[in-house]
Amino acid sequence: MTRRELLFDSYLGLGGLSLAGLLQAEESSDPLAPKKPHLAGKAKNCIFLFMEGGVSQMDLFEYKPMLVKYAGKQMPTAIRTVGELATFSAAPNRVIPPFWKFAQHGQSGRWMSDLLPNLAGCTDDMAFIHGVKVDNNNHGPAVYHTLTGNQFPGSASIGAWVTYGLGSENRDLPGFIVMGDRRGSTIGGTSVWGNGYLPAAYQGTLFRNGETPIVDLTPRPGMTAVKQREELDLLNWFNTKHAAQRTNTSELDARIAAYELAFRMQSKAPDLVDLTGETEVTKKLYGLDDPVTEGFGRQCLLARRMVERGVRFVKLLHGAGGDRWDDHGAIKDRLPVHSQEVDKPIAGLLKDLKSRGLLENTLVVWASEMGRTPFDNNLVTDKPGRDHNQYGLVVWMAGGGVKPGATFGETDDFSVRAAGDEVPIRDIHATLLRLMGLDQNRLTYLHAGRYKKLTDIGGRVIKEIIA
């Protein structure tokens, strides 16, 4: 009889003692227990803000006078024959200028569009990276590449890697939480917050939208804590006995741990999602008083409350279905709506984190899966829009370990691609890990005979934006 079998057979005679507690002595450690970082990193938590669809960098973050000069004209040949830009569209068309005014802000003199008036007031806390490149011009592979480091499904997401490397600081809440757009699911679905080839314990936990992010948080009528504990122990006994007879039990181990976590969350999660204790001033800071900003504002406020309670990685997804940032046409109508939905909530998040002393330990990252082209996509003649551009993405970071007001990289005069060295998306991943105290080359996992890592062949840590 093995030790595990002895534990199983002893279960009923031990008066219903939690099997999870019994196995803890044997397993030696919880996969989500806090772990020491490889390096000294200021960031203990990360909030990753992902704008799905491909955000137009030249309409929000990059002031390019040449777009005004060439408005309505064909782009110079040297620019419009770059890589996939020459083939993805039928043909590069007339240049369309930004339809919104730009102004410089803060001590850093950062140019920002007037579509982001609230974020413009936070630029001295942010660091911008220009000319970021992904390896595919289509949404699906580009989303995967940005959020998992690989163009194809099956790889571990950024949040999974971070929790694998650092564990979680709160055993009563998930270490990696995801909040999606209320209008639908993101491209790739659960894969973009999944564990991939990592153990299933590191996958993200999805919170629902609206005022009830977690369903069935309250036990059903007549269910006492003692009775629920007994039921859970019996269920765990069956699951663990099943697992003992098999080798690859990552999914089942994660399910057992999830049941235990759900039991503990009944006492801790209600306080997390209950916003009644927040002041009206705080709620307005996030835009909860405006139906346009209330949805994403609620998620940003919850994200602050999560990192406040030790959740390691929080991912917020904005844009879904026909309401993504994918402005092939009618950009004058669509981009202001998307921008307004997130501008005040994200600025509120940065200001709130800073006022509470949380920003210095919380890394905030903003990204999309691609940028846009300077020329008209010409889908609808009188409603111009911009095409996909895998070369011109802008990413910004703020908080833990980031140099306030810094800028790295630049794009050409038409905001098509990097004017100097490109910034592959793996450089963003490498920098994120470094700010969290993780070495990209030591954060590995053996799978199918190869040591996998988030940055694949390796990325450059962008030291120019690190304080």
Name every feature range the model reports, one short phrase each.
Residues M1-A467:
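Ligand-binding pockets and gating/stacking loops
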